[in-house]
Amino acid sequence: MALKKNRVILITGASRGVGKGVALGFARKGDTIIITGRSLVKGTSVSQFGLTLESSLESTAEALSKIGAHPIAYQLDQNNDEEVKRLVEMISSEYGRLDIIVHSSCQIHDDLVKPLPFWKKSINMWSLVDVGLRSNYILSYYAAPLMVKQKEGLIIHISSHGARCYMHGPAYGAQKAGMDKMSFDMACDFEPYNVASIALWSGIVLDEKTELVSKNQDDTYVEFLKGGASQQYAGLVIDSLSQDSDYMRYSGKVLIMQELGESYGIKDIEGKNPRSDRSTLGGPVDFESTKVY
């Protein structure tokens, strides 16, 4: 069965980037959208890759309100397990259920896109694993009993082709590969309870950061970006997935966002089909069904 209307949805990392785009593309009138991030107040900016990016949950919340959704801007440090636990306790107390989680937070270091071997980048590149992998586990851990109790739910892990090809170095690759396998293993545990866990490779997303970075790149990179998806596209795809009466068939799978969107007949906001990068960056491989307890 498809997930109910007037959903309670939790989206992490929604102050900017993919998380913000997911929230804007996903929200429907009547939905309660709990958005988390470290930057709350409108007008807040962060520095990344030498760029200044606007980053605030209040800005995302304003846009969601215009759609008719009910946004809850919740300032959260996902390195703090107790804060994560209190968030889930608040959701349970206030709403009594949690229909969908979209894990899109990621702690990105400025060295990420430098063309250097890992030992010449900062050792703090490993923070990608702390927020983006470990954080997904902790939030899912505390939210699982609520979703199991209601016997339905959807957990989405925003992942990447970096799980299969060399991309940005071993810390990034470990995070994405770990995320895909963790999503599969969660799906195994959730199977009796009608809760799906799915990893989605987002591909190139034309968010605030990508568009600014492209101004300093060569023509090849700029051409590569032309097939990218809008910031909102992932949200449109996840919304269609949540409305699918048989969404459980995808539980445990690793899916390419653009291919899933095409299967649902979804066009991007400009009427285009974003490009799948399977042919150049590789595609997902199914995990074995064997279970060892």
Regions found by a protein language model. Name each.
Residues 54-55, 75-87:
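The beta1-alpha1 cofactor-binding region of Rossmann-like NAD(H)/NADP(H)-dependent oxidoreductases
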Residues 140-141, 184:
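A short, exposed helix-loop element centered on a Lys and neighboring polar residues
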Residues 29-59:
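Conserved glycine-rich Rossmann-like NAD(P)H-binding loop of the short-chain dehydrogenase/reductase
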Residues 6-7, 69-70, 97-98, 112, ...:
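Active-site loop of short-chain dehydrogenase/reductase
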Residues 15-16:
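Conserved glycine-rich cofactor-binding loop
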Residues 107-111, 119-124, 128, 154-192, ...:
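Catalytic loop of short-chain dehydrogenase/reductase
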Residues 199-200, 218-293:
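C-terminal helical subdomain
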